[in-house]
C-alpha cells in the first residue's frame, strides 16, 4: 500500500484538519442501509480524524449526531455540513471532556435538542510524543489522563440516566494498549482502563459497551 506524505502537517493539539494537504480521507464508500435510523449519537473528537469518519458513517446509516470538539470551530462546522448532507440533523458542542461540568452540559444539550441518547462514542483523546519518560511534564501527564480517562468516565456518567435498552457505549482505544509505545508512554497508559470500564457498564446497565481499536 502506498502512503502519501502530507505536504503540510499539523503539530498543534488538537490538530487543525482544515490546514492539511492532502486532506484525510473520511468519505463513506457504501450506501447506507438505515441500521441507525432514528438514533442519536454523541461522538467526542468528531471535528476531525476518526471522529469525523464515524460521524459521516453514522449519519449515512440514519443517525442524528452530536459533534463534540475542543477548539477547532472550522473543522467542527465542516463535520456538521457532512452530516447534514446525508440528510441528518447535527449540533456542535464545544466542550472539554476532561471537565465533569462540561460533560454534564453535553448530555443536557443532547436531551434538550433530540430528547434521547442512543450511542456514546468516547473517541476524544490527547497524546504528546516524547523521547523519554523524563520529558513528560506534570502538566502534560495530568492533561492526558484528564482527557483520556476522566473524560470517558465523566461523559459515561452523564449519559447513563438517559440510556435505554439497546443503547451502546463505544470506547475507542489503541493498539498501544497491547504493544506499548516508546514515544507515547502516558498516552498508552490511559488506554488500558477502557476495557474494565466497558465490562462494568455491561454488567450494571442495559447498554452495550465495547472497545474499538482503530
Where are these regions (language model features)?
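Active-site helix of classical SDR
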Residues: 156, 190, 198
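Amphipathic alpha-helical dimer-interface segment in Rossmann-like NAD(P)H-dependent oxidoreductases
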Residues: 56, 108, 112, 147-167, ...
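Conserved Rossmann-fold SDR core element
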Residues: 58, 116-118, 195, 205-214
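Canonical Rossmann dinucleotide-binding motif of NAD(H)/NADP(H)-dependent dehydrogenases/reductases
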Residues: 34-66
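Conserved glycine-rich Rossmann-like NAD(P)H-binding loop of the short-chain dehydrogenase/reductase
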Residues: 63-78
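Catalytic Tyr-X3-Lys loop
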Residues: 134-153, 170, 194-195
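Conserved mid-core segment of classical short-chain dehydrogenase/reductases
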Residues: 4-5, 31, 99-104, 112, ...
Amino acid at each position: 500500500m502506498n502512503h502519501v506524505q502530507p505536504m503540510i502537517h499539523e503539530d498543534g493539539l488538537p490538530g487543525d484538519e482544515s490546514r492539511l494537504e492532502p486532506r484525510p480521507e473520511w468519505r463513506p464508500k457504501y450506501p447506507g442501509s438505515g441500521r441507525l435510523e432514528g438514533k442519536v449519537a454523541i461522538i467526542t473528537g468528531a471535528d476531525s480524524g476518526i471522529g469525523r469518519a464515524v460521524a459521516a458513517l453514522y449519519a449515512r446509516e440514519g443517525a442524528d449526531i452530536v459533534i463534540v470538539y475542543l477548539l477547532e470551530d472550522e473543522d467542527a462546522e465542516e463535520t456538521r455540513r457532512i452530516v447534514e448532507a446525508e440528510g441528518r440533523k447535527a449540533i456542535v458542542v464545544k466542550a472539554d471532556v476532561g471537565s465533569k461540568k462540561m460533560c454534564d452540559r453535553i448530555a443536557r444539550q443532547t436531551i434538550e435538542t433530540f430528547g434521547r441518547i442512543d450511542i456514546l462514542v468516547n473517541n476524544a483523546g490527547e497524546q504528546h510524543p516524547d523521547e523519554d519518560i523524563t520529558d513528560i511534564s506534570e502538566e502534560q501527564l495530568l492533561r492526558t489522563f484528564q482527557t483520556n480517562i476522566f473524560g470517558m468516565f465523566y461523559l459515561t456518567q452523564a449519559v447513563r440516566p438517559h440510556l435505554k435498552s439497546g443503547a451502546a457505549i463505544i470506547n475507542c482505544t489503541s493498539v498501544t494498549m497491547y504493544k506499548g509505545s516508546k514515544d507515547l508512554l502516558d498516552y498508552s497508559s490511559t488506554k488500558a482502563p477502557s476495557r474494565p470500564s466497558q465490562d462494568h457498564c455491561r454488567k450494571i446497565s442495559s447498554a452495550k459497551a465495547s472497545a474499538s481499536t482503530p
